[in-house]
Amino acid sequence: MVTTHHLCLLRSTVLSVPVRLRAPRAPPHPRLPTASASASSYHGPTHLRRLRPLRAAAAAAGGASPDGADGAKRPAPAAASSSLGAALVGFARSNFLPLALIAGIALALMDPTLGCLAHKYSLSKYSTFGIFLISGLTLRTKELGAALEAWPAGLFGLASILLFTPFLAQFIMQIKFFPHEFITGLAMFCCMPTTLSSGVTLTQLVGGNTALALAMTAISNLLGIMIVPLSLAKYIGVGAGVSLPTEKLFKSLVTTLLIPIILGKVARETSKGIAGFVDGNKQGFSVTSAILLSLVPWIQVSRSRSLLLSVQPKAFAVAVTVGVLLHFALLAFNAAALHILSRLEQRGVSVFARNEYARAVILVASQKTLPVLVAVVEQLGGALGESGLLVIPCVAAHINQIIIDSIIVNWWRQRDQQFANAK
């Protein structure tokens, strides 16, 4: 008789019976453990492997390593996201002005409706008035008086800001470029006084003489009300073939710039409460000033959006490059002039050679302000071209000069730290 089912083939059927129906097995005979058996019994069983994640979680919660020893704490995802958020907030605070300017331009390019409506109600004039009102509120007389010690360096800085650097405008006007407003705007930028806040802030960061920086900033902007119209008429009007209304421009700058500065300064000096409030909320006033300044390019770009979109990216890149080269030229000129002046003075240590004075002059005298340029463009009413095209390259130049000078300040600080460590 042929056997069709071998007995070994029936084992799988028996093993497939549910667990509940199986007969209980007798415990195996005890065996002596071997080395391999011990290792497999430690690493092999499933219930021990399942316990390891629980041990690791308990160790992380208690600040210990999974092996039981105290180790370095691993940063939790919530802590990592919190530190990233703090870093982003810190970056936004330290770079609020460039970010606000970029945001204003981007908003105008996406939807110009609100910007055109703001122009209809002359919002840019009120924003400019507010900027210089804040400048007057934050201006300290005591700090201005402290700069008298370095008056030769301050005098050179003022001459560089108001006389020497505007001279470059006539060479920039010789560049043949389309649209011509880009080059005209950069030439006008050369004729402006120094920045209202960034030069002083960077001087303070690098350990320069803040009082000297403040003095040059305040005096150059006040004198600029009288000198800027003359510089524009001489270097820009002749090159552009137009006659600028110098007297009208001077009166408008007095109304838009000088009067709000005087009002702010008088309010600060006559009321200790106002002065204390302003000094205690410097960050808030700085943010407010940046927001007011960002409204201007937002309005100008909204008006000129169709023209800006017709400009080739290559042309804009060339204008940005010219602005960067212009700032490098101003830095090189001021640094070289200070070096020469320090060699000419033989008695003791020259004020031109002292780092705290030299750095203040280099930073402040090499920067140009955007609000005064905007006020000038607003008052000219298109005499030199489309307002938006005049302002756009200057906004880029303003942002680039802050970035470049921030890099220089960081390099100076690192070098000072190396010298201090070497001592």
UniProtKB/Swiss-Prot annotation:
Subcellular location: Membrane; Plastid, Chloroplast envelope
Source domain of life: Eukaryota
Keyword Metal-binding attributed: no
TM spans (from-to): 96-116, 123-140, 153-173, 182-202, 212-232, 244-264, 284-301, 315-335, 389-409
A Pfam family annotated for this UniProt entry: SBF_like
Matches recorded under InterPro entries: Na+/solute_symporter_sf (IPR038770), Put_Na-Bile_cotransptr (IPR016833)
Residue segments, region Disordered: 23-45
Membrane topology: Multi-pass membrane protein
Record-level GO cellular component terms: chloroplast envelope; membrane
Gene3D superfamilies linked to this entry: 1.20.1530.20
Keywords: Chloroplast, Membrane, Plastid, Transit peptide, Transmembrane, Transmembrane helix, Transport
Main localization category: membrane
Transit sequence range: 1-55
Keyword Nuclease: no
Its biological purpose: May function as sodium-coupled metabolite transporter across the chloroplast envelope.
Stated family: Belongs to the bile acid:sodium symporter (BASS) (TC 2.A.28) family.
Name listed for the protein in its UniProt record: Probable sodium/metabolite cotransporter BASS4, chloroplastic
Species annotation: Oryza sativa subsp. indica (Rice)
